[in-house]
């Protein structure tokens, strides 16, 4: 085995917690989350508020990288899945597999599909069937529910 192959193996092992390994649920009370997060992020993530459109700098983010949950830091979307939907919220064609959970939302007259971080339960946004091909999905996210990590930066450790 060459040294380069050995190093690649170590890199793969350390990458497992973010991608591919079993995701362990992070349970915190609303009071604990309120102490950890800015009020605007807490309101969206754990009270299911919606931020105003065109207010998040992440709506215009075009660099390569990963969008992570602002609460627990689980990677949720790759920048390659981001597109400009014209809605004023960061939008994606698909999430990272296994990192998002969905449920029906009946808060408005028309039922919608809400999605949240599978690890901490933080509300992210809603998925609609008006996105670009091939999937036709628009994962419409509240920017305050996400943080962006540029491709040349390491992902933070998952919050405990």
Regions found by a protein language model. Name each.
Residues 18-20:
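Boundary at the C-terminal end of the N-terminal hydrophobic targeting segment
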Residues 1-14:
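N-terminal secretory signal peptides and thylakoid transit peptides that target proteins
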